[in-house]
């Protein structure tokens, strides 16, 4: 199929293959969720602003996107998320006070929150109809370009950021790509699970996807994690607004439709450790891991943890 693309009055034609190989510079961050697992904290602050050590979850997601070459950041938000917008705004009063006190190190830290003018956009998801619907809400900003999706709940610790690893693989394959990891069979019902057509090591050719299958229905133990590189055709599939698991519009179903249309979908086994910061246990595990990884905190924090474990053992 050929596509007519209009850009500032210039017309071009591109094949599907050319679109699939185009460089990915846009990312969608679905951040409209209420974060009810973290009430009462999330009554007044977005879950994405909750911090691992001294950085909010959204900062880890932004840093990963930047490292992968993303230039345009699209946030799909909802009511009560204004703190996310404030976080990426300039803070002249704070900066002036830090300059007055000569706190150059803190001024330098604030630079990570700086966004280039026009690089960030906010789209409101009016109704909570699922992840697929949240992605679909950004369709006009995506237009006919391939794009990434990052779920800030999934924080991945790795030497090379997960999305950057995926981008390198995508440059060779094109198509649609999802981050994947092995999960225990009893936990498969919490994920989208891949049906594997060909296992090539880090890369897996996918023949099907099932959202939150029952344990006996899971086609493999390879689960989808919150990183995606997708073609614009996904938006066409989402536009049909078919309800899937839990009565929601599922992104997994839109990707599965690409498989049915004989378009390439790959799973990518990333190198790194994933933390589910959408759960309290996962958030605490990430806090410990990221705290221990900090040179300025490791010794004191490790000693504290050792002491806590010793006290618990002595009390048993």
Regions found by a protein language model. Name each.
Residues 26, 71-73, 119, 146, ...:
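Residues at the starts of beta-strands that form the adenosine-phosphate
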Residues 21-99, 125, 161-165:
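N-terminal glycine-rich phosphate-binding loop and ensuing alpha1 helix
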Residues 49, 120-122, 176-178, 265-267, ...:
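Conserved beta-strand scaffold positions in the cores of enzyme catalytic domains, especially
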Residues 94-97, 108-196, 232, 238-241:
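Conserved beta-loop-beta/alpha segment of the NTase-like Rossmann-fold superfamily
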Residues 148, 167-171, 200-303:
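Catalytic-core segments of class I nucleotidyltransferases/pyrophosphorylases
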Residues 6-9, 17:
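Residue-identity detector for glycine
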